[in-house]
Amino acid sequence: NTTDPQDIQNAAVKYPALNIFDFQHFRMAHIDYMADTALQWHKSGGLVGFIWHWSVPVDPGFDLQQGYSFYLPSAAGPQKKGTTFSPQKALQEGTPENKQIHRDLEAITKLLLHYQSQGIPIIWRPLHEAAGNSNRGGTAWFWWGNDGAEAFKQLYLYMQKYLMDHGVHNLIYVWTSELDDDNWYPGDAYVDIVARDQYRANNNHSAYKEQFNILKKKYPNKMLALVECDCMPGASQMVADDAMWLYAAPWTVPFVFGSNNTPEFWKGFLHSAPILTRD
């Protein structure tokens, strides 16, 4: 996500306050997460966020030549591979799954400590959308929801403890709600921001007040964010509906611009009184 903020600035003459990156490709040698993109954004006055589409081996026998995936087979679709990787097994010391998550967490810890050493606080959204459709007669979408709510919560706490035990203390934790997944919530002590995804909004720039109010009632002690959307909420609509999300983020191309969020929208949005920008 190195070009979207500049494209928005070109249209609106202001930068958004927050830039969100993804550790999805941390294994790929041609992507240097130690590079200064996030650092320069921070030095320019911006806020830094990271999500992590945590891919694990597809093959149950850990033949790494078969590749990696974060999708479960039921959600992978015909063009992608799925994995049956088990969170329960990953939490059992000494298993291949446990060794895999330790290798991955070790790599991510090095990156997070690098940012911490540069004085960068990170809005951190790992293990997102864990419940998927589990509470609506379907299944989870990603492997971290593969074994249900209790295993997910244990994995979330395991990851959090691992990072803290290894000196990572610059993270603001974001948990994504599906609105009907209270039993998947790790708990107030382990979450800073409760978040929501919203798609199929029909380009109306509403404040999504119904969803905001549901989350506000369920999690009264937490800040609320709209972390993925196709159509951004309008600034005036959020004020009118008393549904002021902490931040909102369109899910990259094609939703940053196009029919969902036009250059004219971005100019009006970033020049609205209640909206903070990097500038």
Feature map (PLM): residue ranges:
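N-terminal module-boundary/linker segments of secreted carbohydrate-active enzymes
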Residues: 1-27, 35-39, 235-237, 267, ...
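Alpha-helical scaffolding within the catalytic cores
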Residues: 2-8, 33-36, 108-111, 176-185, ...
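Aromatic- and acid-rich polysaccharide-binding/catalytic face
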Residues: 181-203, 249-252
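Loop/turn elements at helix/coil->beta-strand transitions in domains of secreted/extracellular proteins
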Residues: 14-17, 44-48, 117-123, 164-172, ...
